[in-house]
Swiss-Prot record:
InterPro entries: HisE, PRib-ATP_PPHydrolase-like. This is Phosphoribosyl-ATP pyrophosphatase. Pfam families: PRA-PH. Its main location: cytoplasm. Its EC number is 3.6.1.31. Keywords: Amino-acid biosynthesis, ATP-binding, Cytoplasm, Histidine biosynthesis, Hydrolase, Nucleotide-binding. PANTHER family: HISTIDINE BIOSYNTHESIS BIFUNCTIONAL PROTEIN, HISTIDINE BIOSYNTHESIS BIFUNCTIONAL PROTEIN HIS7. GO terms for molecular function: ATP binding; phosphoribosyl-ATP diphosphatase activity. Pathway: Amino-acid biosynthesis; L-histidine biosynthesis; L-histidine from 5-phospho-alpha-D-ribose 1-diphosphate: step 2/9. It comes from the Bacteria. It is found in: Cytoplasm. It is an enzyme of class 3 (hydrolase). The keyword Amino-acid biosynthesis applies.
Length: 93
């Protein structure tokens, strides 16, 4: 029997982060990341980008995928914090 795994998409992650920003659940790491501000978020993006590069050079594809997911998360946190929408970015793709 085939087991289905729930997959989060770029759009569903953005919706989840936007919801957390609006509802501000207590103890949320996303809320803390948003409250830390752009400087802190930018530093995390740089850190994660470096980890993506290192994983691509020296680690497994699974480790690389995990690092990319973290980079996407922090990029979206910054987007939400700055009030950007997905369409604002898609317009430039």
């Amino acid at each position: 029997m085939k087991q289905w795994v729930l997959v989060k998409t770029f759009e569903s992650l953005f919706a989840e982060l936007t919801e957390r920003a609006a509802t501000r659940p207590e103890g949320s790491g996303t809320v803390a990341a948003l409250d830390a501000g752009v400087h802190s978020q930018g530093k995390k993006i740089l850190e994660e980008a470096g980890e993506v590069w290192i994983a691509a050079e020296h680690e497994s594809d699974e480790a690389l995928a995990e690092e990319i997911s973290q980079l996407l998360y922090w990029t979206q946190v910054l987007m939400v914090g700055k009030g950007l929408k997905l369409e604002d970015v898609y317009r430039h793709l």
